[in-house]
Regions:
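C-terminal motif of bacterial Sec signal peptides marking the signal peptidase cleavage site
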Residues: 18-21
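Catalytic nucleophile loop of clan PA
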Residues: 65, 175-196
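Bacterial N-terminal signal peptides that target proteins for export
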Residues: 1-10
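A conserved glycine-rich beta-strand in the N-terminal activation segment of trypsin-fold
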Residues: 32-38, 48-74, 92-95, 144-145, ...
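Conserved positions in beta-strands of structured domains
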Residues: 65-67, 97-99, 149, 177
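C-terminal cap/linker of serine protease catalytic domains
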Residues: 24-41, 118, 139-141, 193-235
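Conserved active-site neighborhood of the chymotrypsin/trypsin-like protease fold
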Residues: 57-58, 68-143, 226-230
Length: 235
């Protein structure tokens, strides 16, 4: 098994940590965001998935979202995983292949043969926008409120804690829990504007997402036969 120690990374003066895939936590009740009806959220959940694999001999759990190119998730969710699956809202498992992997932006793209899921549109995030995060850390996809406090450039290491890269991102007001990495941030129009990747160590309810501006790093670099998904992370 390929392994690599992951390190705690910093965003400006705020301490962050990768959202661990180990264990489960209680989740807040689903609450529709302003401008998004309960009916719309039900439709959106058909495009959201739990992502599961085995990494460093431990179960890795994250979230993913269907877009035109495939299922988007975080690179740190699938790094070094074997037997990767996505689980839909009905609890059905589907074998997934990693067709793009970028540890610098913390993005990965998955392909599932024969899977039909409505592909959500992609839009740019706007400061102050209200929306939801579609997350699956509890083992089942659900929606939680997620408001965009700031749209920021993040100076951050790659998923292995190496180097320093500038990543387009956003600061969120959202109650993110372990396993929610890769959860899509959805705006009031029903578009994907980012993917959750971390939460603050210092401030409750503060989380961070990769902006949709970075998605092209994986949606335009697809290898249909699959790609090397790096070494697994010891969380």
């Amino acid at each position: 098994m390929r392994t690599k120690e992951s390190s705690i990374v910093a965003l400006a003066v705020l301490s962050l940590f990768w959202i661990s895939s180990c264990g489960q936590m209680s989740k807040p009740e689903e609450v529709p965001a302003p401008g998004i009806s309960s009916e719309a959220i039900e439709d959106l959940l058909s495009s959201a998935f739990v992502v599961e694999g085995l990494a460093c001999q431990r179960k890795a759990i994250g979230s993913g979202i269907a877009v035109e190119a495939g299922i988007l998730t975080n690179a740190h969710v699938v790094a070094g995983t074997d037997e990767l699956h996505v689980i839909d809202r009905n609890g059905d498992q589907h074998l997934a292949k990693i067709v793009a992997f970028d540890p610098q932006s913390d993005l990965a793209l998955l392909h599932v043969d024969g899977l039909y899921a409505p592909a959500l549109p992609i839009a740019l995030p706007e400061r102050g926008a209200y929306g939801v995060a579609l997350v699956g850390g509890g083992g089942q996809v659900k929606a939680i409120p997620a408001n965009i406090d700031r749209v920021v450039d993040i100076n951050i290491a790659d998923i292995y804690g190496e180097g320093e890269y500038r990543r387009k991102g956003m600061q969120l007001e959202a109650d993110i829990s372990p396993g929610d990495s890769g959860g899509a941030i959805i705006d009031s129009s029903g578009s994907v504007v980012g993917l959750v990747f971390s939460r603050s160590n210092n401030t409750d309810g503060v989380s961070y997402a990769v902006s949709s501006e970075e998605f092209s790093l994986v949606t335009r670099e697809i290898s249909p036969n699959g790609v090397n998904n790096g070494e697994c992370l010891r969380r």
